[in-house]
């Protein structure tokens, strides 16, 4: 996200799968990020929107780890911790509660691509809630709907409520802290779906993320 207000900026790098086979590449990338950028916390975002300035010596960068996959914990988290670099984890909050034997079917139904199922022969592809809580100790937890569900202009209200409001409540109850950020599927902007905005406000989100920007919910 390039700042409209200064020459400083925040970049976002998306990770939708962090398979073991690519661990060396991920480490090289995070090591480079740690050298050339600074990580971004919610407090940094709050200050950025309040002051209209990025006040760090280095530009900001958010590694965005999507979908709540187990490899986001097993593979990516140790690398992030090694370099002390904060990531934002975008969690479809109902995924964690799907029984192990049904998780692959769930991923196929909701367009959560498992590229290397052989990495986890036990069939568990989602993080456990204990693992999500471990991630939450040093990283930001954001809501990516409940079921990895695309919310469109014609989506019924009960689906919007479940995927926006209930999904946030589940995350907050499980990790024991507020969840302030909602991320649309497939990068739609905040203005894409005005009908959904009342649910974002009702739920108490403060920011919404698209492929193009981070927007403050007014």
Where are these regions (language model features)?
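Short alpha-helical segments and helix-capping/turn motifs at coil-helix boundaries
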Residues: 72-75
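Short active-site segment of divalent metal-dependent hydrolases/proteases
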Residues: 69-70, 147
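A short, Lys/Arg-enriched amphipathic alpha-helix followed by its capping loop at the start of a domain
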Residues: 28-36, 79-83, 138
């Amino acid at each position: 996200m390039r700042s409209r207000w200064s020459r400083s900026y925040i970049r976002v790098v998306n990770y939708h799968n962090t398979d073991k086979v690519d661990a060396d590449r991920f480490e090289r990338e995070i090591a480079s990020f740690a050298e050339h950028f600074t990580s971004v916390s919610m407090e940094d975002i709050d200050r950025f929107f309040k002051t209209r300035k990025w006040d760090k010596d280095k530009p900001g960068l958010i590694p965005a780890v999507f979908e709540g996959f187990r490899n986001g914990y097993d593979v990516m988290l140790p690398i992030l911790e090694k370099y002390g670099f904060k990531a934002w984890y975008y969690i479809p909050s109902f995924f964690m509660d799907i029984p192990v034997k049904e998780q692959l079917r769930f991923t196929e139904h909701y367009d959560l691509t498992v590229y290397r199922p052989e990495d986890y022969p036990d069939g568990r592809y989602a993080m456990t809630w204990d693992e999500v809580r471990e991630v939450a100790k040093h990283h930001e937890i954001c809501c990516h709907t409940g079921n990895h569900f695309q919310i469109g202009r014609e989506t019924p209200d009960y689906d919007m409520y479940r995927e926006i409001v209930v999904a946030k409540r589940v995350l907050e109850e499980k990790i024991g802290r507020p969840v302030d950020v909602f991320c649309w599927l497939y990068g739609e902007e905040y203005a894409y779906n005005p009908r959904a905005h009342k649910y974002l406000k009702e739920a108490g989100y403060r920011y919404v993320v698209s492929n193009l920007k981070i927007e403050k919910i007014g």
